[in-house]
Amino acid sequence: ALSSAASDVYKRQTVPDTDKMSILYYNQNQVDNEYKKRVCENFFDVSAGVYTYSWEKPYKGDLEREIENYEELSKQSTSDDEKSFFDDYISSLKEQLKTATDEREGAGDYSADAFVGSKGENMYMISFNSTETGESGGFSIDYYPSDQLINYRPKEGASSVYCYSSDYYDGEDTANTATVSQDDAIQQGLSFLAGCGISDIIETGCTDLIWEYSDTSYNTLASEKSGYVITYKRSVDGIAPYTPSVYNIDSLNSSDDVWYDTMDETFELQIDDNGIVSAYCYDYFKATGDKKENVDLISWEDAVKALPKAVNTYYAENKTQYSSIEFNNVQLAYYKIKDGDKYEYLPVWVFAQCEKTGDGDSSQSDDGLD
């Protein structure tokens, strides 16, 4: 049954203008050769060459460079175990040299799934996710795997560096030393994604970029704050749709964990003074251009009236351990559903119970009931 506390949540809601919402239609995106070409040539310095990358048949020059990096790490190692680990890995790389290719293979028709090229003085890899299974789509950009990120941002005494969002940083609060402003970095990201053919997005979060330096024993030597981690999401009529990643859904009908994935389209870019450091883009859908405007919506009052019956009917068939349900997250939002082989974003009232995680966060991504 619904708790009386839920009515307090209802009273605090700001109900948006409900006569201007639409239904928008989408197809599942196809990561075809043209898609790959557009992304690669939008990022790499094409004049310097774009090449395929094969994990099975690596390029000899890559292996030689990686061997050189690990030989230096072996020299810096402070224990026999560390040195043994590096030396064993060097031996495996030298074994791969026997069958490595002497020349890189050009991108050609972009039918491969991974490509390498340069951006300024640095090399990067772009990897694409296939949509053939209907489970993934998009791409990632990473600093070239045969190099170490420490070569991109070296620091005396450090053998490695790891960069991540300040959301996960618990060190001393210092100023962001990047000369690029947060607003300019956000615009850089939007411009890059637009060049990839991804324009219907909106920025939903921006944090500082942390660079954490370590020695060969992975002891942290120093941390610096320089750059930004920017998150964009699909924009439907100018707002980010409701795309929860709900897990541990309560049900007594199954002993297994129950979860629900809405294929959240998220585009996360790390940007510093040199530009894009990395990117992780989940580009699942593409708008068809079709749109049904000013659709009729159930009113707020009618939605609240219908809620108790809907909840009680659902849990009559799906038993729960909850004795009461207190919705603490209510919103009018766009939500994606599948209709045949197409998808549509349509306006819905969302009533959710979200519970706090160990870090105190309470969001639509936590354990919950919708």
Model-predicted regions and their roles:
Residues 169, 185-361:
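Segments that shape or occlude catalytic/ligand-binding pockets
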Residues 1-258:
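Preferential activation on post-signal-peptide N-terminal prodomains/segments
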Residues 360-370:
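C-terminal structured interaction module
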